Regions:
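Amphipathic alpha-helical interface elements
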Residues: 1-265
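Beta-strand/loop nucleic-acid-binding surfaces
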Residues: 305-322
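A general sequence property marking short-to-moderate contiguous segments
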Residues: 263-273
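Short aromatic-glycine-enriched beta-strand elements
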Residues: 295-301
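OB-fold/S1-family single-stranded nucleic acid-binding modules
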Residues: 334-349
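Structural detector for short beta-strands of small beta-barrel domains
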Residues: 272-295
Length: 349
């Protein structure tokens, strides 16, 4: 009953995508194990995708600004640089697109505007950059924005060396075309969307055996590493630090798939855990000494960091009249915009 309840809650139709003969999902338990394997792959994939998204959008934006500043220095006298650079449109990627020239990009921007307004955030370049999707930035990496197209926005090839300094042909050493780079990014965006919609990462119509499925996942991840290198090789070190590459290596194996297929068999014997955080949460309390007391509040010096905390009468167990100067107390700290942080739930020791 437990396995059936899980598969029904995950959607029978969606679950059927894991019932591939090639993966050996002969039973509901094994199919659930394949689902769990995909969940772990998605989790290991996420840091690489996040690095690509953040580094790509920042590289495109900053490269455009740097190019415009460079043009100012080439075309104006030094005493005019500050004035002319101030005229550079910091929202160039927002103001460029209209309903007429690029409806999809314009629609993405309108969605970002609505989100920022809803969150009561200013419409700054930084906030727009964080709200626009990976797909928006990927759509800029194509020959439509090449100088030869003479379109409403020109990005390439003059920004290529800034955005993708290491995107070169491994044989000739010559820079890769923007279309070649863009095609790789489009494939990565498809993987990101597949992951966000909880779909299998291994789709491969030409797969004959399970090894082909696993190799497809490896190819997807390798593509991510390649693009990260193109933009900034140093970011690859981040994946090593958090052991993402190690996790992917462990998961992309026949043994990992087999192991996950066995896991659900023991589910019926497991207890449902409803108190996970118990024993995990870290005690945030401080101890300290009351160093000043009035009719309405106290000041407490923390033993932990020697900071001074403000405690109101309403935060004191039993009321302020039950406390005295130099009393030892326990309290929960809380940040405040006032002179002192707050002390909450104040109790005598």
């Amino acid at each position: 009953m437990t396995i059936q309840a899980i598969t029904e809650s995950l959607s029978t139709a969606r679950f059927s995508t894991y019932q591939l003969p090639i993966l050996g999902g002969a039973s509901p338990e094994q199919c659930l194990g394949i689902y769990l394997w995909n969940k772990q792959l998605a989790s290991a994939f996420l840091p690489a995708l996040q690095i690509i998204e953040i580094s790509l959008r920042n590289a495109i934006y900053q490269s455009w600004i740097a190019h415009e500043e460079e043009q100012v220095e080439l075309n104006f006298q030094p005493h005019d640089w500050v004035t002319e650079k101030a005229k550079i449109d910091k929202l160039w990627f927002v103001n460029t697109f209209t309903r007429q020239n690029n409806f999809i990009a314009w629609s993405n921007i309108q969605t970002a505007v609505k989100q920022l307004n809803y969150e009561n955030k200013p419409l700054t370049a930084e906030n727009f950059i964080s709200k626009l999707t990976l797909g928006f930035w990927v759509s800029l990496v194509q020959k439509d924005f090449d100088v030869q197209k003479n379109s409403y926005l020109t990005l390439w090839p003059h920004l290529r060396h800034r955005v993708f300094p290491n995107a070169v042909d491994s044989t000739s050493g010559s820079p890769l075309s923007i279309n070649s780079i863009g095609n790789e990014l489009k494939d990565i965006n498809k993987i990101r969307n597949r992951l966000s919609h909880h779909e299998p990462l291994w789709r491969n119509k030409k797969a004959y055996q399970v090894e082909d499925i696993i190799n497809k996942v490896i190819e997807h991840y390798e593509r991510c590493l390649k693009v990260i290198y193109w933009i900034n090789p140093s970011n690859l070190k981040l994946l090593d630090i958090i052991e993402s590459n190690t996790r992917m290596s462990d998961l992309c194996s026949l043994h990992a798939l087999w192991k996950n297929k066995q896991l659900p068999a023991g589910i019926p014997t497991l207890q449902v855990r409803k108190d996970w955080s118990k024993g995990v949460k870290i005690n945030p309390e401080h101890t300290g000494e009351i160093i000043n007391i009035t009719a309405a509040n106290v000041l407490i010096k923390s033993d932990k960091n020697q900071a001074i905390f403000y405690g109101a009468d309403r935060a004191m167990q039993g009321g302020i009249n039950t406390f005295a100067l130099n009393d030892k107390v326990r309290f929960t700290p809380e940040a405040s915009s006032a002179k002192y942080p707050n002390a909450k739930n104040i109790m005598k020791l």
